[in-house]
């Protein structure tokens, strides 16, 4: 396994903007590698080393860690790919994609002003605010995309599967965060939390079935490495679009 300089690794993983900033943090004893304070920014470190930076976040939000867990679990490479982040919010998913080498990310959200400044000013990022993905013109967003990611609240992924198809082409990879509290019935939650594992698993199956109906092959599911609000257990599902885009920007799986 090839080792990289620590300062290079810190920049690649998004902790610092450049090597000089990383060096200052190392000299200030703010960086640990495998639970030992680093004394040199030039030390060679394995890619899978445990790196901890005091008072620094790797991603702009917790969502980045969720998506990173999925990319690792699925072995998904996004280098050089065009991506769409549906429900981008602060931009945790987008941040993760860019750090993983994505060529570009289009960020779509119904709200305004939430996207982190570091992403807003990144030339690889296109921002679409106050946009309802159900009503959006796929062409205006830049569809079809190589990768779709989705982290949505108050609406289930299952209901939007045909929309995802309209944004896809044959081979498009979809990775979505399944939040059982928004996929299940109100009587199946307790103060907004789905505690019954059988209910959680059923919601995942329903999302996979909806994706299949829309032309996707749901190839994998993994539990999110961190929980959602109030300790909700969440899941990430990966699917590949098997249809093809037709006139009007709608994938075959998006037809009724």
Write out the residue ranges for each language-model feature:
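A basic, amphipathic helix-loop patch mediating RNA/tRNA/ribosome contacts
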Residues: 1-47
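Conserved alpha-helix/loop element of class I SAM-dependent methyltransferases that forms part
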Residues: 62-81
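Conserved class I S-adenosyl-L-methionine
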Residues: 79-89
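Conserved SAM-binding loop of SAM-dependent methyltransferases across substrates and taxa
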Residues: 90-101
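S-adenosyl-L-methionine
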Residues: 106-159
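A short glycine-rich, Lys/Arg-flanked "PGG" loop and its adjoining helix->strand segment in the class I
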Residues: 158-175
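Short, glycine-/aromatic-enriched active-site segment of Class I SAM-dependent methyltransferases
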Residues: 180-196
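Core SAM-dependent methyltransferase catalytic element
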Residues: 226-250, 255
